[in-house]
């Protein structure tokens, strides 16, 4: 069974020539929305995502505007409002060393450099300069860990284990 990943959400149409307005969920919109690439539309009703080929991409304000082959006017794309744009796992590109997809990080166990278990990563936030990992602790409130070299010492995706240095005031 194919594992699918969201890269955007179709929130509206734009104009009358079949453009759709997308709120992007990818860090690589220029690469992901390149003309000729295939994305998959998954509608709100469920079912298997179906392929669409990108014929144009441009940015407008905070949105990405896309058109698809075979969908040349607003009436043809109106049905896609609220749908998700997805890619199969085999279309995920290789990342540089020290970079990870969210789905690789979420679910990893977090330990201190002394070996004390802190919890499991349940969410990744992107508030600004660096990502923040939300750690679900066995007891008490969630813990927020900044993804910076001074704190995150080692990430082992294969073993789903992250080792951190606890800076003063972090816990």
Swiss-Prot record:
GO BP of this protein: ribosomal small subunit biogenesis; rRNA processing
Domain PRC barrel: 97-170
Gene Ontology terms for molecular function: ribosome binding
Gene3D superfamilies xref list: PRC-barrel domain (2.30.30.240), RimM (2.40.30.60)
One matching Pfam family: RimM
Entry GO terms, CC: cytoplasm; ribosome
Keyword Cytoplasm: yes
InterPro entries: PRC-brl_dom, PRC_barrel-like_sf, RimM, RimM_N, RimM_N_sf, Transl_B-barrel_sf
Keywords: Chaperone, Cytoplasm, Ribosome biogenesis, rRNA processing
Intracellular or extracellular location(s): Cytoplasm
NCBIfam families per the UniProt record, alphabetical: 16S_RimM
The family this protein is said to belong to: Belongs to the RimM family.
Notes on the domains: The PRC barrel domain binds ribosomal protein uS19.
Function: An accessory protein needed during the final step in the assembly of 30S ribosomal subunit, possibly for assembly of the head region. Essential for efficient processing of 16S rRNA. May be needed both before and after RbfA during the maturation of 16S rRNA. It has affinity for free ribosomal 30S subunits but not for 70S ribosomes.
Subunit details: Binds ribosomal protein uS19.
Protein name per Swiss-Prot or TrEMBL: Ribosome maturation factor RimM
Organism of origin: Bacillus thuringiensis (strain Al Hakam)
């Amino acid at each position: 069974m194919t594992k699918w990943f969201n890269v955007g959400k179709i929130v509206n149409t734009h104009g009358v020539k079949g453009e759709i307005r997308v709120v992007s969920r990818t860090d690589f919109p220029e690469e992901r929305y390149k003309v000729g690439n295939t994305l998959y539309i998954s509608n709100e009703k469920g079912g298997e995502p179906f392929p669409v080929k990108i014929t144009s991409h441009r940015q407008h304000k905070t949105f990405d505007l896309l058109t698809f082959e075979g969908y040349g006017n607003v009436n043809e794309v109106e049905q896609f409002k609220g749908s998700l744009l997805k890619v199969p796992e085999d279309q995920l590109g290789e990342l540089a060393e020290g970079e990870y997809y969210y789905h690789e990080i979420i679910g990893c166990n977090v330990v201190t450099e002394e070996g004390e278990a802190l919890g499991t990563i349940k969410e990744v936030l992107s508030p600004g300069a660096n990502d923040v990992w939300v750690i679900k602790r066995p007891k008490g409130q969630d813990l927020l860990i900044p993804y910076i070299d001074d704190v995150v010492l080692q990430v082992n995706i294969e073993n789903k284990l992250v080792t951190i240095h606890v800076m003063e005031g972090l816990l």
